[in-house]
């Protein structure tokens, strides 16, 4: 891919589309939205307003990382919206994964529209990439930035990366000068940790899975492994264990570590046994609510990478 030509075309396209209007971009700190943000910033400068929504479903340290990177280092107009209570309320009692994704998508858009009205933006730029809409079109699962969009969108949508795959987005990010800590980040689902909790989402469950997720990422990095994705899932199943001489009844965490080129297919990684043992030991030691850790060895297909 000739990235110079690609950037030139996209910058021209975004600049002509937005004109004298303003645009907002859905920024998560992941490689897709970060790349789309830098591309759009190149095109329209201060007419771009980056919107970062703290859903309550983010990775450990994510909000601080995003604010520091984009507001302090890139100098972008960054609007930080703390919408945690709003998302948890909207998901109360909801257990169906597809419904969860759609609700999260709807609340996302509501938040964006409110900010857009405040700043007078007409355009919403999103970091949607090819696998997102292919999976949504194929009815595999809704992606919050496509399937969750309401029929009547009050903002005009611009998706500059929609024909690219993840490996291409990483190349583009590198070309645009994004730091390695962003372009080499593991993919993270738009709905965040909400789809790594099976069943109803509560602040307590998110706290558990956030800690477990951080442990998995830390140990994978420490072992020098370079998977496509590595994460933890709270299964919502309690099992019997032993604590001292007493019977315990605690939560179960599944660990998923996969290799892939573009996310369309994936293989469970053959992780060294001592790494898995260290992950299991740390999760059960550091998170008192968890008593059992499982390793998922299923490929994609038949499974998807995320559990929901």
From Swiss-Prot:
- Record has Membrane as a keyword: no
Annotated Gene Ontology cellular component terms: cytosol
Assembly and partners?
Heterodimer composed of a glutamine amidotransferase subunit (A) and a GMP-binding subunit (B).
Keyword field contains Cell inner membrane: no
InterPro entries assigned to the protein according to its UniProt record, in alphabetical order: GMP_synth_C (IPR001674), GMP_synthase_B (IPR026598), GMPS_ATP_PPase_dom (IPR025777), NAD/GMP_synthase (IPR022310), Rossmann-like_a/b/a_fold (IPR014729)
Specify the species. Pyrococcus abyssi (strain GE5 / Orsay)
Classification via PANTHER family: GMP SYNTHASE [GLUTAMINE-HYDROLYZING], GMP SYNTHASE-RELATED
Q: What does this protein do?
A: Catalyzes the synthesis of GMP from XMP.
Q: What is this protein called?
A: GMP synthase [glutamine-hydrolyzing] subunit B
